[in-house]
């Protein structure tokens, strides 16, 4: 644990805490750095409650000085800090650490030669981001009240974790927590990527207005297409393989939502023993193979 803390710049973290609105408000002793240290201690020890965390800290009381702690925090103090200190502080610390140590993270892209197969790195791999969500069911008795009542009468309780990850980094760039009932495309509104980036996502994130925003910002997206989307076909080309079978259909389509007009590329790929896959993108330069790989 002390080795982990050596990677943390205490003064920089305190600076982030002071610059985050409300992070150091009404704070006497339990500053942002000490709060971070305590929470990391609880995570690494796999504690599930503040009571466990308090007991664990007491058991390690003789080592607190080595952790940069100058006193033993009480459970009530920690509970109040969890309420008062804004999450933006921890998000800023994470962003700072990611920027500082990203170069030391393992590159998850396939090697140029692996198990006899060669892989030529593509230009788009360098700026490829992936977005997805995972639902966490909350089954403890104390958490059974979380969620909403749908028409079926069954409660959709739990949390949903929305994540944006850079392809070759392998750790989240953005993490948002919402109720399980929150629609996936919620996070899409919050995502702002560098120009010329490519964003891969599932069909749950389909939002024509946000797709137009990404296009205007110079960001490429690739996603699976929903069946119920209404669109107008502007151009259509059918490609046939050497066996005379349809390999894929490449179309330029237009979506109209009131005054909003968004033009995109619809690619339907056919397989011998599988259902066809329909993909949607705003990139008209990628090959069909690249789009399918993304």
Segments (PLM) and residue ranges:
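Single, function-defining residue in the core of a domain
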Residues: 1-52, 56, 85, 92-93, ...
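Blade-loop segments of beta-propeller domains
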Residues: 60, 64-67
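Major-groove recognition helix of helix-turn-helix-like DNA-binding domains
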Residues: 67-87
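Short alpha-helical linear motifs
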Residues: 76-80, 99-105, 239
């Amino acid at each position: 644990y002390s080795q982990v803390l050596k990677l943390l710049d205490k003064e920089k973290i305190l600076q982030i805490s002071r610059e985050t609105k409300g992070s150091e408000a009404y704070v006497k002793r339990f500053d942002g750095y000490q709060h971070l240290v305590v929470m990391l201690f609880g995570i690494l020890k796999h504690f599930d409650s503040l009571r466990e965390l308090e007991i664990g800290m007491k058991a390690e009381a003789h080592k607190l000085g080595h952790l940069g702690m100058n006193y033993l925090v009480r459970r009530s103090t920690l509970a109040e800090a969890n309420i008062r200190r804004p999450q933006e502080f921890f998000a800023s610390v994470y962003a700072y650490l990611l920027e500082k140590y990203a170069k030391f993270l393992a590159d998850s892209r396939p090697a140029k030669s692996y198990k006899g197969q060669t892989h030529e790195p593509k230009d788009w791999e360098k700026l490829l981001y992936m977005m997805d969500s995972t639902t966490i069911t909350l089954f403890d008795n104390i958490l059974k009240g979380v969620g909403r009542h749908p028409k079926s009468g069954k409660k959709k309780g739990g949390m949903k974790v929305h994540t944006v990850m850079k392809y070759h980094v392998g750790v989240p760039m953005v993490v948002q927590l919402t109720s399980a009932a929150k629609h996936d495309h919620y996070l899409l509104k919050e995502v702002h990527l560098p120009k010329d980036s490519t964003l891969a996502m599932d069909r749950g994130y389909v939002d024509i207005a946000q797709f137009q925003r990404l296009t205007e910002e110079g960001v490429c997206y690739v996603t699976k297409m929903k069946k119920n989307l209404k669109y107008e076909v502007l151009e259509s080309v059918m490609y046939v393989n050497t066996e005379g079978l349809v390999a894929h259909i490449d179309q330029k389509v237009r979506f109209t939502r009131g005054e909003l007009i968004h033009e995109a590329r619809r690619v339907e790929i056919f397989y011998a023993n599988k259902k066809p896959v329909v993909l949607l993108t705003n990139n008209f330069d990628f090959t069909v193979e690249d789009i399918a790989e993304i």
